[in-house]
Regions:
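A charged, well-structured terminal subsegment
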Residues: 282-295
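Ferredoxin-reductase
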Residues: 2-92
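Local cysteine-cluster metal-coordination motifs and their immediate loop/turn environment
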Residues: 126, 228-230, 250-284
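Short glycine/proline-enriched turns and hinge-like loops at secondary-structure junctions
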Residues: 27, 41-43, 109-111, 257-259, ...
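FNR/FR-type flavoprotein reductase catalytic core
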Residues: 85-247
Length: 295
């Protein structure tokens, strides 16, 4: 999987639904044939989808995987209203109007040796995309992926065969696909799922970071996507250990192309605090610049 340099041009295309698999708790994994978007998508990008001809407002959906070879993108979503319910009824071969890829993705120029990827809930898909990107485009990196969910994970899990000395031995649940790629992962939940850390994903991240020595910790950079409160905790964790941290924010969006300014957040810039649009100025920002995380 290779991706050219991110472009600001947005493409409107009629994507064809290739497959759609249902998982527990009304979670769905769809694969769309979308040549223009797949050619340009990077981890952190999203698409704006028309869920049904009778539903005026589009829905923003983060991209979980992108294949230039197959001209496809993967979307993972949960039914949470009329729009996503309409998506769940789509059949193989149906056409879905989408705009993409949108936004500023994760910056991947100066990777440190130990990228720590933290995803929670609907923020899991971009983290999977980033993990795959690191695997396919870099060498000598050792990413560690942590994912938390309070509903059953919408993918195959298994006890990990990759030992992590800094994590309790009984915390061994991993994402099978990441394990196949040779990427270390651990899962967390408050629901006592087998092998999962019984707590918040940031708590397990703290345990891991605390047990690293100073030299190891200097090689860590955090990339995260998830609910606002989780990202706030991730930001505090980065500050505690003096780590670089990029976060992908979640906000309600109307136009998703920068026109309505309905998804603005206060960001610290060189010129002072400014309102930035999550859709096009983000969704990825440096955690230390997000004002709401430091109040």
């Amino acid at each position: 999987m290779t991706h050219p340099k991110t472009r600001n041009t947005l493409y409107v295309e009629q994507a064809e639904l290739i497959s759609q698999d249902a998982h527990e708790n009304e979670q769905y994994h769809m694969i769309l044939k979308a040549p223009e978007t797949s050619m340009r998508a990077s981890p952190g990008h999203f698409v704006h989808m028309q869920c049904d001809s009778n539903i005026y407002m589009r829905r923003p959906m983060s991209i979980m995987r992108s294949s230039v070879k197959n001209n496809t993108i993967d979307i993972l979503y949960k039914v949470h209203g009329d729009g996503t319910n309409a998506l769940s009824k789509k059949k193989i071969g149906d056409s879905i109007d989408l705009i993409g890829p949108i936004g500023q993705p994760f910056k991947m120029k100066n990777y440190k040796k130990r990228p720590l990827l933290i995803g929670g809930g609907v923020g899991i898909p971009p983290i999977i995309f980033l993990a795959e990107y690191i695997k396919d485009t870099t060498k000598n990196l050792n990413p560690f992926v942590l994912m938390g969910s309070e509903i059953p994970f919408p993918f195959k899990t298994q006890p990990s065969k990759i030992l992590i000395n800094e994590v309790p031995a009984d915390v061994n649940a991993s994402m099978a696909l990441l394990e196949d790629w040779g990427i270390t992962s651990r899962l967390t939940s408050l629901k006592n799922y087998a092998g999962c850390f019984n707590g918040y994903v940031t708590e397990l991240a703290d345990i891991w970071l605390e047990k690293l020595d100073d030299d190891q910790r200097k090689d860590v950079e955090i990339f995260s996507c998830g609910p606002t409160q989780m990202l706030k905790a991730v930001s505090k964790l980065a500050k505690k250990y003096n780590l670089s941290c990029q976060v992908s924010l979640e906000e309600y969006m109307a136009c998703a192309v920068g026109g309505c300014a309905g998804c603005t957040v206060l960001i610290k810039t060189e010129n002072g605090n400014e309102m930035k649009r999550v859709c096009v100025d983000g969704p990825v920002f440096e955690a230390e610049t997000v004002i709401q995380f430091h109040n």
